[in-house]
C-alpha cells in the first residue's frame, strides 16, 4: 500500500511539472514578453488564451483577401491582409501572437537596419523553424545559430565566392541547353508558337545547376531527391496552415506528419548515397560535397556526422534551386506582361551573346538591363516573404528593448513596396530604378533584402544571380514571350512565393 501511495505521489508530481511546463510554454512565457514590450508602448491586437491572434488572422483573411485587384504586383492583401490592417492600426512596429509565440513585426527602417548589427548568437534563427522545417533543412546552415552556424558558414561560404562561380558558368550553360532544345522542338511542332507552362522546366533547370555545380552529378541522378523535396515542401506548407492550438496536431502521428517523416527518411538515405559516391572523387565541380563531408568529421559521432551532411546538403538542394527557380518564373511573367522591357533586355542579350558559345563573368557584367530586371523581380516577388529571427538574449532595436524569446519578423514584401522608401510607383515594375544600384534605388538600402540582411545574408546569391543572368540571356535570344489567356495571376505562399496556378506563356521562336 505504501509503495502504491508513493508511486501515486511521484506521478502527481511529474504530472504537475508537465502541466507547469506546458502552461509556461503555451502562455506564461508569452505573457511576460508581452508585458515587457507593452510597457514600452508597443501595441497590437489582443490575444486569446492558447490561440493568440490566429482566429483573428483567419477572419481577416476571409474578409479582406478579395480586395486585391487582378494583375497587381502588390498581393500583400491576398496573402497577408492582417499585416496591412495591423500596420495601419498600430504602426510599423506591432506585436501579435500565434498562441505560444509572441511575434514583434518590424518594418520601421531604423529598426530593420539595427537587426543587421546583431550576431546570430544574439538574434538568430527561431528554434521553432529548426523543428518545423527540420525535414527540409535538417540541422544545416539555414537553421543553426552561434558557434555551430559560424563553423558551417566557414566551411560552405568559400564554395560560393566569385572565383568558384566563374567555374560554374559553363555548368549553367550546359543545364540550360536541354530546356532550349525541348522548347524549340515543341514550338516547331506547332508552327513557330505555342503555349508552354514554364514552371517545371525552370525548376528542373535550376535543380540541374545545383546537382552539377555542387554535387558533381546531373539532375537526372538527383531527380528523385528534388522530387521528394518538392513533395516535402508542399506537405509542410499544408501543415503550416494549422495555427494556434491546432498547431499541436503537427507533432501527433497524423497522416500528414507520417507523410513528412517518411519523405524525410527517404531523402536522408538518397543524400547519403550521393554524398558517399561523390566523396573524394577528385573533380573541381564537387568540392562542396567534399567540404561538407570533411567538415562533418570534426569531433562528431557517426550519427552526428550524418546529420551534419544531410542537413547541409538539404539546405543547398532545396534553398539553392527553389528560390532561383521561382525568381526565373516571375522574371518571365513580368517580361511577358511588359513587352517594352522584354525588348530592351533582348537587345542587350543579343549584343552580349553575339559570337559567344559560352558566356563568362565579363559578359555577365555587361548584362546591365537583365540585371535590373532580376533585381526588380526580386523586389516585387521575393521568394521568401518574411525574415524571421529570435532574440536569443535581450537585444535592443532602435529604442525598444526586445526580451529574450521574442520572435522578430521582418516582412520583406512590405519593405519592398514601401512608398516612402521607393516612391509612389513602388507597386509598378520599373527595372530602371536600379540603373545606379540599390543605394540609389531607394532611400535606405536595408529596405531591399531579397537575400537577407546582416551576417546571415544568403551565401548563394552570387550563384543565383549568375544562373538567372545566363538563363534569361539565353532564353531571350531564342524566344519571345507573351501572356497566355489561361494565366491567372494568383501568387501563393508555399514556403516560397510562387504562381498559384502555374505560369503558362505563349512562346514564339525567334527567326
Curated annotation (Swiss-Prot):
Keywords: Heme, Iron, Membrane, Metal-binding, Monooxygenase, Oxidoreductase, Signal-anchor, Transmembrane, Transmembrane helix. InterPro entries: Cyt_P450, Cyt_P450_CS, Cyt_P450_E_grp-I, Cyt_P450_sf, Cytochrome_P450_Monooxygen. It comes from the Eukaryota. One of its GO terms (molecular function) is iron ion binding. One of its GO terms (cellular component) is membrane. Its cofactor is heme. Residues 28-511 are cytoplasmic. SUPFAM superfamilies: Cytochrome P450. It holds the Pfam family p450. Its EC number is 1.14.-.-. It is a single-pass type III membrane protein. The chain crosses the membrane at residues 7-27. Belongs to the cytochrome P450 family. This is Cytochrome P450 714C3. The lineage of its organism: Eukaryota, Viridiplantae, Streptophyta, Embryophyta, Tracheophyta.
